[in-house]
Amino acid sequence: SSKPEMFGLDPSSAAKKALKIFSDYKIKNIVELGAGLGRDSLYFGKNSINVYSLDYSPSAIASINIKIQSNNLSKIITTKLFDIRKKLPFEDNSVDACFSHMLYCMALTNEDLQSLNNEICRILKPQGINIYTVRSTDDGDYRQGIHRGEDLYENQGFIVHFFSKKKIDNLSLGFENISITSFEEGSFPRKLYFVVNKKI
């Protein structure tokens, strides 16, 4: 985007909801997948959660690193340039929780998503939590623009993968689906689902 700082440093509403869940489960170490410019990683870090932030964009990682330094959070937030379509760089059963805000809506096929979910399941400890948000099929942009196969649509150069509750259920192999909650974000507004899965 032409204004990479448009999200500012305010955390997403999804991160605020996730923090409450992390504290309920006494979770202290998380992996954020697709950390973007780091607004949620910083929020978790400032709330004493150790964060391992992954993103495939070098400029995003550079931006997070500057914010980590200026907020004195280098002991609590670690970044890594990484493409989440590859095997995640963590041991089996080693992570308390994963968080991703709209990562699953990127230009990922159903097969990519299943593979990502399997990897998240692999790295989570037993009873570990995966929280993710996705654009819903109730969203105003669904079925707009150029259809790119499955539930992927391209608008203004961006490809978005939209999710029904059924698609979310189909992605829960190895997990218990704790909750799927609808919420809205932004002025459009975007319509999303907030998904909480617990590793079985």
Annotate each language-model stretch with its function.
Residues 85-98:
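A short acidic, Gly/Pro-enriched loop at the edge of an enzyme's catalytic core
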Residues 106-107, 139:
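Short glycine-rich, flexible loops that bind phosphorylated cofactors or substrates
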Residues 100-103:
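A short beta-strand submotif of the Rossmann-like class I SAM-dependent methyltransferase core
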Residues 119-126:
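Conserved helix-to-beta-strand junction in the class I
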Residues 107-119:
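A short, conserved alpha-helix within the catalytic core of class I
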Residues 1-25, 30-77, 81-87, 129-200:
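Class I (Rossmann-like) S-adenosyl-L-methionine-dependent methyltransferase catalytic domain
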